[in-house]
Amino acid sequence: MAVKKEPAWVTMGDRVSIWVVTIGALIVAAFILVSFVVTTVGQVSSGEIHFPVFTDTAVPAGEFGQDRGLTAATYTEASLSATGLSTGVVATFIAANAVNTLVALIVTLALAFMGWRWLKGDPFRQSVIYSGIAAAIALMLGPFAALLLSTTATTRALLEIAGPKEGRSDLIFAAEFNLAPFLAGVGLAIVLGIFEAGQKLKADTEGLV
């Protein structure tokens, strides 16, 4: 049975680097999973939820030295801790955290799988493409789902804690989305598409020879 080997340009340093990345990805994945389990168990057992909210609270300019030219200041975010929230709100917070955890696990495990296939001498197997596609989809869709869940949970939690806004300006019902994971997913999908097209072109060319 023929054994596939890396190209001649793959050095020992490359192999060491791939080993480090592969093992590192597995360690990170394990840490992420354990962290999620510990956090979830803590939230369920204590009933206490920690979450950030946007604020628009004025800060007395004198606290920062008004004589130096500062005329106004505001807090833009606050970290809240609350107990006694309804089961639905707690479950929604946990679901949002679960989605973020799942995205991180898919990406890190895909990276570890790619490294493992390379170390086995078969980095271009179709399963590697599939794992990359899974990571790209997770990066593009996961953050949107997590944002929807966390925003819903935060809004419901604020309503339970403070009631309707009724003209207050200290708590803001808003959300912030980071486009970096989505763009990373798009970039990964493009790279995988180009790679797949190149593989098919190579196969077609070899078939003509």
Please give the residue ranges for each predicted region.
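Alpha-helical transmembrane segments of integral membrane proteins, especially early/N-terminal helices
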Residues: F51-T71, A98-T108, P143-L148, E196, ...
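Hydrophobic alpha-helical membrane-insertion segments
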Residues: I23-T57, G132-S150
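Long, glycine/tryptophan/cysteine-rich extracytoplasmic
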Residues: V44-L85, E166-I172
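Cytoplasmic juxtamembrane interface segments
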Residues: A2-T39, V107-A135
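Transmembrane helix-loop junctions in multipass membrane proteins, especially transporters and channels
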Residues: T40-F51, L119-G121, T154-A162, L208
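Alpha-helical transmembrane segments of multi-pass integral membrane proteins
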Residues: Q126-V209
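Individual transmembrane alpha-helix segments
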Residues: A73-A104
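Selective recognition of hydrophobic, aromatic-rich stretches within alpha-helical transmembrane segments
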Residues: F93-A110, A174-V186
